């Protein structure tokens, strides 16, 4: 079902939240923010895979894309969730997420990384080529890894 990614995004976003809760014994705004960062990231990531590998998914009887096809509505949703993934990731800079914080250097790094994610999503939106879906998938993996490292190093330094 096209709902598979949405349903899977919920347990897929738990690890960061659970890590925070295990370390602090508190389900606070920090844990919720980490959950939302991971939750919104999953849509462009998995839908880009579904886009690029749509023939294989169709042969297996899976409908990965939200509309069931590679169309403007699907690519617009990918772009929408990419923007939200970035926006949620910069919220800690504004000091409203408790102990989860970002310095000016951290937020600038995430904005730059986020620009790559959004640009990759926009490229897919413009032309719908599998090549751009593959680039977005790779960009999404790099984005998530580097924002996690940004939060880690920003806290250390």
Where are these regions (language model features)?
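Transmembrane helix-loop-helix
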Residues: 1, 80-138
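Residue-level signal for inorganic ion chemistry
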Residues: 4, 45, 140
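Final/C-terminal transmembrane alpha-helix of multipass membrane proteins
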Residues: 134-155
């Amino acid at each position: 079902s096209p709902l598979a990614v949405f349903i899977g995004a919920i347990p897929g976003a738990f690890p960061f939240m659970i890590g925070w809760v295990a370390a602090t014994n508190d389900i606070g705004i920090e844990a919720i923010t980490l959950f939302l960062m991971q939750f919104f990231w999953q849509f462009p990531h998995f839908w880009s895979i579904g886009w690029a590998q749509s023939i294989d998914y169709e042969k297996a009887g899976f409908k990965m894309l939200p509309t069931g096809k590679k169309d403007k509505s699907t690519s617009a949703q990918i772009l929408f969730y990419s923007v939200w993934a970035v926006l949620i990731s910069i919220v800690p800079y504004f000091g409203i997420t408790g102990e989860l914080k970002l310095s000016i250097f951290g937020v600038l790094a995430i904005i730059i990384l986020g620009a790559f994610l959004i640009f990759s999503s926009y490229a897919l939106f413009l032309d719908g080529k599998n090549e751009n879906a593959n680039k977005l998938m790779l960009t999404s993996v790099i984005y998530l890894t580097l924002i996690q490292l940004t939060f880690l190093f920003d806290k250390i330094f």
